Swiss-Prot record:
It comes from Bos taurus. This is Interleukin-2 receptor subunit alpha. Keywords: Disulfide bond, Glycoprotein, Immunity, Membrane, Receptor, Repeat, Signal, Sushi, Transmembrane, Transmembrane helix. GO terms for cellular component: membrane. Non-covalent dimer of an alpha and a beta subunit. IL2R exists in 3 different forms: a high affinity dimer, an intermediate affinity monomer (beta subunit), and a low affinity monomer (alpha subunit). The high and intermediate affinity forms also associate with a gamma subunit.
Amino acid sequence: MEPSLLMWRFFVFIVVPGCVTEACHDDPPSLRNAMFKVFRYEVGTMINCDCKTGFRRVSAVMRCVGDSSHSAWENRCFCNSTSPAKNQVKQVTPAPEEHREKKHTDAQNQTQPPEEADLPGHCEEPPPWEHEREPLKRVYHFTLGQTVHYQCAQGFRALQTSPAESTCMMINGELRWTRPRLKCIREGEHGQASDDAEPQESTEAPPGSGTFLPTRMAGTTNFQKPTDEIATLDTFIFTTEYQIAVAGCTLLLASILLLSCLTWQRKWKKNRRTI
């Protein structure tokens, strides 16, 4: 085998798998009169670093990284003002004590590690960052193995008492969310619980439908009241950087295949001339 072909195949083996991510491209199932929570995030989960109008993000996304022994959020989100005037520091000489305190605070902010999870291998809900666009409407990119927990919206109750959850799994070669078994009826109504009750698809937008409740209580099954802070999960939208990365990986793979074909063709012609 020619050295060039061997090098390209080694390059494909090393680089191309890194371009493939086990991301759940669809949102978790939406149930009528129900909402879901996420207690902890799988390693690989990403959050869009969205900023308010007049500010731009430093990093495109914040990612949960780590392994079974340690996990944390990488690339914390920061928003810088797009106005030069706001970025200018006023030329005011601070008092010595204020200067030392400010210097210590700045150094601490720069060296402070990302938020760590209580449970290794997972990350908790990160705190809001300064100038975040809408903390209650963050855009999450879930990964394989992520589980979300469902509960009925305020004013509704579940017919069954068993936990209702959905997990992103590999099903028939595709990443899909499992169907949660939950049926919610209005409080005061009488209904018969059934283990075979199928989840109802949401055909309208009733109160609490399709909402997202982040929580920092990892590993617990006690739901907060629906009146707590909630966040609507926006439609999954790839960031521009992610689209560019996917396009680059596709172009790279096509180029490698083309070069491999050309190398094989040249080798074949060379062998034919020798014969």
